[in-house]
């Protein structure tokens, strides 16, 4: 990759590439900027919002950018694609709401989050047709604190938690804090690169020492938007074996063209829904991760109170303001963004297929993540042996370093 390549040249602004395996070839994207711009123009047809202008986040204490410069140096590191946040400016309504609040110049204790809860309920109703009762919503400082509280409430120490793997690596931290153990139901990949549940294995793992199923919907990193039939089958099996479903749906606002997000709480079987807690946020949707705000809810009051007992949220005034502004006024911005992200996925799939055939990518159904399959290329540079020599965790971690040094792009190792 050329050193002078702008970081928006390839997949402008869209989240993280996760490298499953590793690349033995440098992806030469020089000269692709116009092609991507044309692709977006043809796919979207213009609009009110500018998602093309380069927005420099360096110097903002960003994990995605500044941490990588500290780690690798600015000569090697040029493009950050290893953290799941976007590089677009947030919609103006958020900045305007924050500016208005800062004029009060006092940061005393918060009184109520009811207005935010109302906005959350309206968002779910308007976008997904879900009737979420306001009294069932609990505001959290992130999805992780909510999940940890739920695991503490329902899972004794050393008990097992089912997860469909590959999955979001942050879940292992939640298990650590709740002193629980991963029970991995490995997804099956078909010849077309699409992942499916191994149902026999899933049910076999619903053992008496398993108390929770940590569902990711849409799934990180594969991008699966689980169908209603899949969700019902998962829920039915969990209910049968006394396992509670914890549905992390943080990526639900990103669904690609022709796909459908089905909220677990919208399933037609009340008993299945009552056996679940849903966790959501718009931190991905509007790049608000630093504002530390999320929520969870359940239709089961007994289960909800058990989780609330273990949950504590020290909320941030500006986080409340920013999130409420996003829920109430951010929809037009998001509606304009979604086809842009969809076009990014299309471009990535087409470009990699034609220019980098050893890197396999199947367009995700949802999320703004790209799950790249590169394991065939690990052998090309003997990454396994070199990782061992360097004392690195895996060949993928060696390849993360290798890609930064040669392609100047930082990806999530995916292992």
For every predicted segment, state its role:
Residues 43-142, 149, 328-329:
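N-terminal small-domain helix-loop-helix segment of the aminotransferase-like
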Residues 341-342, 355-406:
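Conserved PLP-binding catalytic core of the aspartate aminotransferase-like
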Residues 47, 152-215, 225:
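PLP-dependent aminotransferase-like
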Residues 189-259:
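Active-site phosphate-binding strand-loop segment of PLP-dependent enzymes
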Residues 178, 240-241, 407:
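Helix C-cap/helix->beta junction micro-motif
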Residues 1-18:
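N-terminal secretory signal peptides and thylakoid transit peptides that target proteins
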């Amino acid at each position: 990759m050329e050193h002078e390549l702008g970081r928006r040249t390839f997949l402008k602004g869209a989240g993280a590439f996760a490298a499953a395996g590793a690349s033995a070839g440098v992806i030469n994207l020089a000269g692709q900027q116009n092609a991507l711009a044309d692709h977006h123009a043809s796919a979207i047809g213009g609009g009110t919002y500018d998602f093309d202008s380069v927005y420099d986040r360096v110097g903002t204490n960003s994990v995605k950018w500044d941490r990588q410069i500290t780690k690798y140096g600015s000569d090697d590191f040029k493009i950050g694609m290893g953290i799941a946040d976007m590089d677009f400016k947030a919609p103006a309504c958020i900045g305007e709401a924050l500016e208005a609040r800062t004029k009060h110049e006092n940061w005393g204790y918060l009184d109520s989050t009811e207005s935010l809860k109302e906005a959350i309920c309206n968002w779910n109703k308007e976008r997904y047709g879900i009737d979420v009762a306001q009294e069932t919503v609990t505001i959290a400082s992130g999805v992780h604190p909510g999940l940890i509280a739920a695991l503490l409430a329902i899972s004794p120490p050393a008990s097992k938690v089912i997860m469909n793997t590959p999955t979001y690596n942050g879940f292992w931290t939640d298990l650590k804090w709740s002193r629980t153990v991963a029970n991995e139901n490995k997804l099956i990949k078909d010849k077309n690169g699409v992942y499916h549940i191994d149902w026999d294995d899933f049910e076999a793992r619903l053992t008496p020492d398993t108390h929770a199923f940590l569902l990711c919907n849409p799934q990180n990193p594969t991008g699966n938007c689980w169908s209603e039939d899949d969700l019902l089958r998962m829920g039915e099996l969990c209910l049968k074996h006394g396992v509670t479903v914890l549905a992390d749906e943080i990526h639900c606002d990103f669904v690609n063209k022709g796909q459908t997000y089905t909220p677990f709480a919208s399933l037609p079987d009340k008993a299945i829904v009552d056996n679940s807690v849903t966790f959501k946020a718009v931190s991905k949707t509007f790049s608000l991760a630093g504002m530390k705000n999320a929520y969870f809810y359940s239709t089961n009051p007994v289960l909800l109170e058990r989780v609330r007992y273990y949950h504590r949220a020290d909320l941030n005034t500006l986080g409340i303001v920013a999130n409420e502004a996003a829920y109430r006024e951010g929809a037009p911005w998001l509606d304009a963004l979604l086809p842009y992200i969809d076009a990014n996925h299309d471009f990535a799939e087409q470009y990699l297929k034609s220019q980098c055939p050893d890197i396999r990518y199947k367009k995700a159904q949802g999320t703004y993540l790209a799950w790249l399959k590169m394991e065939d290329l690990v052998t090309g540079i003997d990454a396994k042996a070199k990782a061992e020599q360097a004392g690195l965790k895996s060949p993928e971690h060696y390849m993360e370093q290798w890609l930064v040094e040669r392609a100047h792009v930082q990806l999530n190792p995916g292992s």
